[in-house]
């Protein structure tokens, strides 16, 4: 990627920036001149390279690329400058790799699903639909953790929000989703319900996927969101719908929670991992609370030693991991964990 950048612009990427885009940036408001045909090809090439980076694990730039890819047909000079910044950010943090943690997250302090009476609600008493033709489960069970978020009026021209969902197997992120919503919501409450519907769809997919692979799945999925009003409306049978046009998402989320295997809980925004999939985040706060605990990064290998018995690297006194917890129980301490690094 860096060599292609050098070929296009005859210079190395500027690596002074510590985030993909400036916090609170709105590229749709850019009024700089349009690019010519040759520059458009370069712009599309940069977007394609960045999308490839996302597919191999660099989802910290996904919100920026989701936004910038909308302008591929007619990009402006300011859009090209923003893409150059994203490439510079990737080159600056080129050592970022996903940490693979295979031990179970500690949710001992997390409250369980409240014993609400869903049987006498409109959803009735029903359980999870488990595939009958799945192979018998073998091996260590997997605990699934999901984070979801919505960014209201991400695009100020259309008023549309962005949905962000991230799924963890044990303590490892394996699936990330970032997409602009198709409708313009008038309140965060409605945008969060659309994101809640998406995370429920993801839960169904991942649990079925693991069962068909023959892996035992934990009887409960942990789902974290930062809009308490939406979560209360979803988890309490007596709650009322505040926005009628969200009625389908409202009933879908509540019907899934009534099955008893989704534990949807509130979490502070600064610990919500899906926040980086919905907003143009800044370095301060976001990097240390969300980015650093998930990615292996240059300079943290001093805390690693090679354990010949495990044949993997083991982290000692990993403060970033202790901060992570896996973000759900908010700063719960972790035991030293096995780490395997991939690109």
Where in this protein do the model-derived segments appear?
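RNase H-like nuclease module associated with reverse transcription
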Residues: 71-74, 143, 182-343
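C-terminal reverse transcriptase regions that engage the nucleic-acid substrate
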Residues: 1-109, 268, 277
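Mobile genetic element proteins and their domesticated derivatives, centered on retroelements
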Residues: 2, 27, 50, 58, ...
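Flexible loop/turn segments at secondary-structure boundaries
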Residues: 72-73, 106-108, 153-156, 174-175, ...
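Alpha-helix capping/termination and helix-coil
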Residues: 54, 90-97, 117-122, 151-155, ...
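Structured nucleic-acid-interacting core domains from mobile-element enzymes and related host factors
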Residues: 88-150, 215
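RNase H-like nuclease fold core
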Residues: 50, 138-190
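Eukaryotic intrinsically disordered and solvent-exposed regulatory patches
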Residues: 36-37, 129-134, 150-154, 182, ...
């Amino acid at each position: 990627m860096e060599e292609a950048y050098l070929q296009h612009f005859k210079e190395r990427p500027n690596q002074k920036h510590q985030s993909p885009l400036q916090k609170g940036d709105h590229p749709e408001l850019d009024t700089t001149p349009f690019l010519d045909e040759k520059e458009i090809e370069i712009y599309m090439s940069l977007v394609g390279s960045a999308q490839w980076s996302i597919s191999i694990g660099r989802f910290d730039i996904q919100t920026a690329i989701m936004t910038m890819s909308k302008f591929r047909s007619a990009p402006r000079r300011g859009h090209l400058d923003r893409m150059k910044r994203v490439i510079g950010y990737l080159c600056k943090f080129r050592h970022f790799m996903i940490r693979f943690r295979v031990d179970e997250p500690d949710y001992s302090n997390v409250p369980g699903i409240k014993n609400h009476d869903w049987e006498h609600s409109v959803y009735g008493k029903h359980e999870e639909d488990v595939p009958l033709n799945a192979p018998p489960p073998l091996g260590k069970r997997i605990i699934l953790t999901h984070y979801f978020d919505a960014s209201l009026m991400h695009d100020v021209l259309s008023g549309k929000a962005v949905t962000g969902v991230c799924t963890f197997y044990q303590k490892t992120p394996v699936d990330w989703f970032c997409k602009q919503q198709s409708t313009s919501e008038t309140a965060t409450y409605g945008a969060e319900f659309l994101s809640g519907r998406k995370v429920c769809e993801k839960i169904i997919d991942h649990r079925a996927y693991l069962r068909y692979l023959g892996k035992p799945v934990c009887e409960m999925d942990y789902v974290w969101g930062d809009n308490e009003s939406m979560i209360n409306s979803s988890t309490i049978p007596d709650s009322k719908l505040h926005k009628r046009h969200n009625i389908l998402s409202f009933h879908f989320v509540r019907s899934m929670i009534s099955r008893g295997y989704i534990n949807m809980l509130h979490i502070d925004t600064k610990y919500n991992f899906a926040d980086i999939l919905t907003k143009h985040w800044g370095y301060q706060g976001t990097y240390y609370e969300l980015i650093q605990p998930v990615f292996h990064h240059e300079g943290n290998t001093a805390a690693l030693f090679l354990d010949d018995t495990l044949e993997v690297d083991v982290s000692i006194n990993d403060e970033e991991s202790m901060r992570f917890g896996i973000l759900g129980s908010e700063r719960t301490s972790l035991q030293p964990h096995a780490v395997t690094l991939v690109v």
